[in-house]
Amino acid sequence: MKVKAPILLLFVFLINFCFSIKQTQQQNFDITIDNNNYNNNNNNNKNEIINNNNKNNNNLNDEYFEKLGYDTNGTKCDICKFGINQVQKMIASKQGIEDISKYAIDLCTYLHIEKAEVCNGLIPLFANMTYNVLSYPTVTGEYVCGFVGFCPYVPRNSSNIINFPKPKPPHVPPVAPSPNSPTMKILHISDIHVDPVYESGMNADCGEPLCCRAPNGPGVGEKAAGEWGHYLCDINMKMVESMFEFIDQEFGEDIDIVFWTGDNPPHDIWEQTYDSQINASQLVTNLVKKYFGSTAKVFPAIGNHESLPVNSFPLPPGSSWIFNALSYDWSDWVNVDEQVANLQYGGYYTLPVQSGLRVISLNMNWCNNGNLYLAENSTDPANMLQWIVDTLQASEDIGEKVYLVGHIPPGIPDCIDSWSEQLLQIVNRYEDTILASFYGHTHRDEFSVYYTQSDENDPSSPMRASNVIYTTPSVTTYQHQNPSFRIFTVDSNTGYLMESSTYHTDLSQANLNGKPTWLLEYNTTNTYNIPNLTPISMDLAIQNINSSNSMLEDYHVHYYSASPYPESKPCTSISCKLDYICKMKSAAYLKYYECIHHEVNNYLLNESDDDSIKSHKKLNILLDLNNYLNNEVLKSC
């Protein structure tokens, strides 16, 4: 049995990469930090957090690991390094992929990570990637485990300094457009995840990553898939078509631009094939063409679920099969030779909207820490960061404004820290060129703000808002989400954002009434009492939410698109508030840790206790936050 130790690695990957999509197993959010030595200028904050993970968070079978010869008092970091080292020993002894896959399937089944059929389908999909990456001579257990988030991560290029071709010109604050200005409308849809074999009446709680299918058998009561969908499953084609029909009827030719930011396939990640992935893209492409192909300019972006297996994007030219397929599907819109070449090379491109305004579509899988291929090069995979700089510089030189669109927001744990920090530098350098950024991936409705020094020559100067990320809620209901889309109203002349309007349908009511009713859920300016969507106004929105419990609860409800979940879990705790406020203030993920400590210190500022008692209170707040993040915040991927 000792030979089975190596597949511990694959077990770790199953947990961390969200392969099993189990809500309690995504990301490490442990916040037990040394209160006295907090330095927010580097990775030390996050690494202290990771180092304090303990075995209570591992959810592993201790008896099994003791049989493997592993000390179960170790941290998740220790477990990960142990597994990596064992696999690398197995590779060095010339044992093959088939051996590792067999052992991984045995472990996956033995520990009930997934049902046997899921283990048998899922693990072989990842075996080649795992074997190949761990065969790199420079890849160590410590490095890989840091990369995936279980250990302190030290990127090979630790400076992360971007060299810009020209110095930054003096900042010119944006002038909000007049309310009477002519406008355009941008439709943003993301994370459709349509399941073409969804079947009403089937079991929605089947114990697999995706249910509501005929092989799952019939469900009973609330666990039966509804006619229009179920909160535990991906969306069905019937509901997707209803959404597109509503948009067409309500807005018609008023939609000028469509941002479509990826993730078309369902979450049946253990059953997927090259053909199924391509077919999923074609299915959604045909819908977008049907409703907007002749009336709007469409700008797609690639998601992490487009590849096979999920999250897996080898460095160029290793991902050419999916990039070429998408290039074919998107040929009505991405049809300039130079940009077709960029798309086929790295999954990114840029195109003009009109004179003075362009879109840069990013492949955010080059920052995805679920993409193990980036262990080989996480500094600037596919040269996309340098390409972004070159493209933005060209736009700045001619006074052109830019929208950034992509799938994975850079301020969440799924984006590699060092890469995220580099993008932060780029956005702040070109803040007067970039109008806003638009992402999806989390399935939730959220926004975050970039900040920079008010005087960039003075590191002690106060911070000011420089740009904004808008994360649009998903079309899919997976998980606990009402189907949603967003309409931005923008100034026709300048492209400046004026309003953000989010629409959804109540899935429970759709199933009850026999048809969905699509409604405006909220307008951002009215809900958060701000005049417009400039970075300064969105920073004001954060201040308003921070000072108003009712506004915070509104944000909480909108975060889940007014699904039943927030009604059962109101945002009344310090932890809930801390999490939301710091997400809003963290367009780069390491800023989240900085924000947490800043907010907690402010909270304790007026306490009359001595320092030791304050330190104890702070630790308790951080422990409560850690528990909240691991047990109450729903994750999607």
Swiss-Prot record:
The protein's UniProt keywords, in alphabetical order, are: Disulfide bond, Glycoprotein, Glycosidase, Hydrolase, Metal-binding, Secreted, Signal, Zinc
**InterPro entries (alphabetical):** ASM_C, ASMase/PPN1_MPP, Calcineurin-like_PHP_ApaH, Metallo-depent_PP-like, SapB_1, Saposin-like, SaposinB_dom, Sphingomy_PDE
One of the record's GO molecular function terms: hydrolase activity, acting on glycosyl bonds
**Flavoprotein as UniProt keyword:** no
Gene Ontology cellular-component terms listed? extracellular space; membrane
What main location does UniProt list? secreted
Q: Give the glycosylated residues.
A: N73, N128, N157, N279, N377, N523, N546, N606
Entry similarity comment:
Belongs to the acid sphingomyelinase family.
Instruction: Spell out the protein name for this chain.
Output: Sphingomyelin phosphodiesterase B
Q: Which organism is it from?
A: Dictyostelium discoideum
Lineage, opening ranks: Eukaryota, Amoebozoa, Evosea, Eumycetozoa, Dictyostelia
Task: State the gene name recorded for this protein.
Answer: sgmB
